[in-house]
C-alpha cells in the first residue's frame, strides 16, 4: 500500500515539477533538512545563508500563490504546516 502511494506520488512529481505547489513543497523539505543540520552545527554560516535564501524564495512563491489563487494557497499551507505570510 505504501509503495503504491509512493509510486503515484513520484508520477505526479514528474508531471508537476514546475508548479508553484511543488516548488514550495521542495523548498520546505530543504528548509527542514537545513534546520535540523543547523541545530547540530550552529556556526555553519554558509548553511545559514543558504537557509535564508531558500526562505526568501519560498516566501516570494507563497506571496505569488496567495495573489493568484487564495484557495490553493490556504490548502498548501495547511498541508505543509507552515504559517501564513505576514501582510504589510
UniProtKB/Swiss-Prot annotation:
<keyword id="KW-0934">Plastid</keyword>
<dbReference type="InterPro" id="IPR000589">
    <property type="entry name" value="Ribosomal_uS15"/>
</dbReference>
<protein>
    <recommendedName>
        <fullName>Small ribosomal subunit protein uS15c</fullName>
    </recommendedName>
</protein>
<dbReference type="GO" id="GO:0009507">
    <property type="term" value="C:chloroplast"/>
</dbReference>
<dbReference type="GO" id="GO:0006412">
    <property type="term" value="P:translation"/>
</dbReference>
<comment type="subunit">
    <text>Part of the 30S ribosomal subunit.</text>
</comment>
<dbReference type="GO" id="GO:1990904">
    <property type="term" value="C:ribonucleoprotein complex"/>
</dbReference>
<keyword id="KW-0687">Ribonucleoprotein</keyword>
<comment type="similarity">
    <text>Belongs to the universal ribosomal protein uS15 family.</text>
</comment>
<dbReference type="InterPro" id="IPR005290">
    <property type="entry name" value="Ribosomal_uS15_bac-type"/>
</dbReference>
<dbReference type="GO" id="GO:0005840">
    <property type="term" value="C:ribosome"/>
</dbReference>
<keyword id="KW-0150">Chloroplast</keyword>
<keyword id="KW-0689">Ribosomal protein</keyword>
<dbReference type="InterPro" id="IPR009068">
    <property type="entry name" value="uS15_NS1_RNA-bd_sf"/>
</dbReference>
<dbReference type="Pfam" id="PF00312">
    <property type="entry name" value="Ribosomal_S15"/>
</dbReference>
<dbReference type="GO" id="GO:0003735">
    <property type="term" value="F:structural constituent of ribosome"/>
</dbReference>
Amino acid at each position: 500500500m505504501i509503495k503504491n502511494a509512493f509510486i503515484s506520488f513520484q508520477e505526479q512529481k514528474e508531471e508537476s515539477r514546475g508548479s508553484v505547489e511543488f516548488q514550495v513543497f521542495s523548498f520546505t523539505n530543504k528548509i527542514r533538512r537545513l534546520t535540523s543540520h543547523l541545530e547540530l552545527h550552529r556556526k555553519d554560516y554558509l548553511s545559514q545563508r543558504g537557509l535564508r535564501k531558500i526562505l526568501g524564495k519560498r516566501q516570494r512563491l507563497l506571496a505569488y500563490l496567495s495573489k493568484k489563487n487564495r484557495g490553493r494557497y490556504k490548502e498548501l499551507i495547511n498541508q505543509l504546516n507552515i504559517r501564513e505570510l505576514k501582510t504589510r
